Amino acid sequence: GGLAGNAGLFSTARDVARVYQMLLNGGEIDGQRYLSKETCQLFTTETSKISRRGLGFDKPDADDPKKGNCAPAAPAGVYGHTGFTGTCAWVDPVNELVYVFLSNRIYPDVTNRKLNQLHIRERIQGAIYDAMKKK
């Protein structure tokens, strides 16, 4: 037992988006600095040849975009996080985009795998990129 900073934190999509917007802004939002630009860069840069992850966030798979947790249309610089309950949040610095998807994939119970099997998070993110292309 004990307390952990995962699988049990609750927030609104708006507040999650503000945290990710702060990261996109290099650690600052509304004129207030929370993290240095260097820290944001460290958290979001791939740091290993054997993992696609940064120190704090997931990244697309450079060798096979279909293997990662984001849409194949997402540019290489995106970073984000997927959660056990089906949530995800991604930052796209190239397009200055923050994408937040909050869900409860474990309803009615933990064996519900439809959200993952149907690639819902990636498909929604892909639809966003498709809409941006049409603009």
Predicted feature descriptions by range:
Residues 1-135:
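Catalytic loop of the DD-peptidase/beta-lactamase superfamily, centered on the K-T-G motif
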